[in-house]
């Protein structure tokens, strides 16, 4: 059984520097108010069997320009700054739930600035759902654990990237994290918080999960709309009625007792990011941050042939990863 402190504070650093074949990373997506700057910063720790190749890093993804950088640091430059919350340091940069203070001078690139996060929309936790994985959060030795730090928040501040000024006044952000030994063999992930309704955020992921001697599909879909969460998960009894996947389009329908969700994601320009395999950052993750997502949420009426429309909206600046090896559909 995993420790209560770790389970009850999933946003904080879950590992320790003595682990082997272990990774942990926080995905910080930020979009400027004018939507011209679309970035992701991913502080990561990668612990291998061979300590000499273990390291920490900051992966930077410019979704508009298609630029990916992997800034590597010695393990001694990693510091966990809180046992209860997401707050870490890599080199001279600090990442937390309150924002990012960036000071990167690596690989011929310079990124400096401070971004402040406010109005965070946090996952609603309880004893049965300490994190987005629900009761599965208590299971030891899972290949990958997944968490959401903030579904949606306001981003303010200025970043200078190689001298270019990027202003994030009234921007929008999203933070999630993964930790474990490796990314799944197959997965699909998508997210957007840029809908016509500013108080709407959506994320969906499905992955092939090894459990005991089986390989199962596990999925998670969360909508935050006007202050309310709608959750569809494999552990809550929701069912995927339809899942169509090709290299650029994903369509699915999910249903539980009260709601039906229909979604279609169309992939934008995509680029290759590093992903973990047994703690080694040698895997691949092909991601777009300029994709589009159409969602429709219906409530099932007492009359089984009647439905009430709750949401019908179109998301832009969407993150999308289609990494299926014909295992999911």
Where do the language-model regions lie?
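Structured soluble/peripheral alpha/beta segments that form catalytic or ligand/cofactor-binding pockets
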Residues: 1-329
């Amino acid at each position: 059984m995993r420790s209560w402190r770790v389970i009850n504070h999933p946003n904080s650093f879950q590992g320790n520097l003595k682990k082997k074949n272990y990774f942990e990373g926080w995905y910080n997506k930020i979009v400027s108010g004018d939507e011209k700057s679309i970035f992701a910063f991913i502080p990561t720790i990668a612990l291998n069997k061979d300590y000499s190749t273990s390291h920490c890093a900051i992966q930077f993804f410019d979704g508009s320009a298609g630029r990916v950088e992997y800034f590597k640091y010695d393990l001694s430059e990693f510091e966990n700054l809180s046992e209860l919350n997401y707050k870490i340091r890599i080199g001279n940069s600090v990442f937390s739930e309150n924002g990012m203070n960036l000071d990167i001078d690596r690989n011929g690139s310079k990124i400096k600035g401070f971004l402040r996060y406010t109005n965070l929309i946090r996952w609603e936790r309880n004893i049965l759902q300490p994190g987005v994985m629900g009761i599965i959060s208590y299971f030891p030795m899972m290949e990958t654990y997944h968490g959401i730090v903030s579904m949606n928040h306001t981003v303010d501040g200025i970043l200078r990237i190689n001298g270019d000024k990027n202003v994030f006044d009234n921007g929008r952000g999203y933070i999630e994290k993964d930790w474990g030994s490796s990314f799944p063999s197959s997965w699909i992930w998508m997210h957007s918080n840029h809908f016509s309704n500013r108080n709407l955020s959506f994320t969906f992921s499905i992955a092939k999960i090894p459990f005991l001697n089986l390989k199962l599909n596990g999925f998670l879909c969360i909508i935050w709309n006007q202050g309310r969460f709608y959750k569809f998960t494999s552990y809550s009894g929701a069912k995927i009625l339809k899942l169509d996947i090709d290299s650029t389009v994903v369509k699915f329908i999910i249903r539980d007792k009260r709601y039906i969700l229909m979604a279609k994601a169309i992939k934008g320009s995509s680029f290759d990011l590093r992903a973990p395999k047994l703690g080694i950052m040698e895997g691949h993750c092909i991601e777009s941050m300029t994709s589009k997502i159409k969602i429709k949420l219906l409530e099932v009426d007492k009359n089984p042939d009647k439905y009430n429309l709750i949401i019908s909206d179109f998301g832009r600046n969407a993150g999308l990863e289609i990494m299926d090896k014909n295992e999911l559909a």
